[in-house]
Amino acid sequence: MKVYTAAQMREREQAAVDKGTSFDQLMENAGSSAAQDLMRRHPQAGRALIVCGKGNNGGDGLVMARYMQAQGWHIDILFSLGENLSPLAQTNRERLNGLPHIELITVQELEGRLKKGYDIIIEGIFGTGFNGALPTEIAALCRLLNHSDGLKIALDIPTGLNCDTAEADPDTFRADLTYTFAAYKPAHLSESGKTYCQETVCLPIGID
């Protein structure tokens, strides 16, 4: 079992790129492998909410959206930190243009959509670089998601949880399933971290 800190993970990603892959390919591998595992678990297409931050964690979610809609899923996407995305996340947002069954929604629309219910809620707001306290608006969003129905999935690490120390904001997203990539992070294996991660699945993405 491989376990990497956030800093070690960044080093491994850079090493993979130095050997000839690209950050775009790593994101594609992460999002596609998570989507494929999820659809094996839930072969019946339904409704999903994907909550994205503006960085590469959200980019993984946008890749998932592309693969899920191809299998008949109806996807709502919420950009929780605005629409000024990282270059890789923006690239994957643009790849969704023109695809059916994908809708971008606002925070104002979210509560009504949650009342209708989602089969799956995928959270990709903050990734392994998070530490400290959640911004007020993200804490409120996590509270809303935590009290909603549907299978809850975190990408890499639940937002609000420090992946190295397992320190958690009181409003940390509470996942039923966490997909992590290339290696486990220390928080996935700690008793306090497991409270928020629940089942953690480590997926290979082409990183040693």
Report residues per predicted region.
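Positively charged, low-complexity intrinsically disordered leader regions
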Residues: M1-Q44, D208
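Conserved active-site and cofactor/substrate-binding residues in soluble primary-metabolism enzymes
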Residues: Y4-A7, T21-S33, N56-G59, P87, ...
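Short, solvent-exposed coil/turn linker segments
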Residues: S22, T106-E109, N162
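YjeF_N-associated NAD(P)HX repair module
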Residues: M1-Y4, R10-E11, A16, Y118-D208
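Nucleotide and nucleotide-moiety/phosphate-recognizing core
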Residues: A35-I125, A133-L155
